[in-house]
């Protein structure tokens, strides 16, 4: 084998090893986004919920700042229960539809049903809860104790 071929092979192996350490992206995040859009009839973009209060977005701690933030805490807790059942909620794909009455789930497995129900409950909660701009992108180190 030529030295150049060995270098290419080595580079491919190293890049594959590095890629294996990258955690997978949440696959159902897109589905959750669509459920939110369906529930609130497009009145607020889904990304507005990604960094809201103490629980909407990555992580979560302290006391929820308002009703909308409580929706996110309940959603986090629901995912925690799904994990206890042996499900992987951030990776679980499910079937859902956006009907005239809003979103609904149509899934087959227990994990799909449970995770879709978690997302559906949160999406409907978001739709009925007031959005307070002052709770977007807050300093969680100070307000979420």
UniProtKB/Swiss-Prot annotation:
One of its GO terms (molecular function) is calcium-dependent phospholipase A2 activity. It catalyses: a 1,2-diacyl-sn-glycero-3-phosphocholine + H2O = a 1-acyl-sn-glycero-3-phosphocholine + a fatty acid + H(+). It is found in: Secreted. GO terms for cellular component: extracellular region. The active site is at residues 75, 119. PLA2 catalyzes the calcium-dependent hydrolysis of the 2-acyl groups in 3-sn-phosphoglycerides. This is Basic phospholipase A2 cL038.
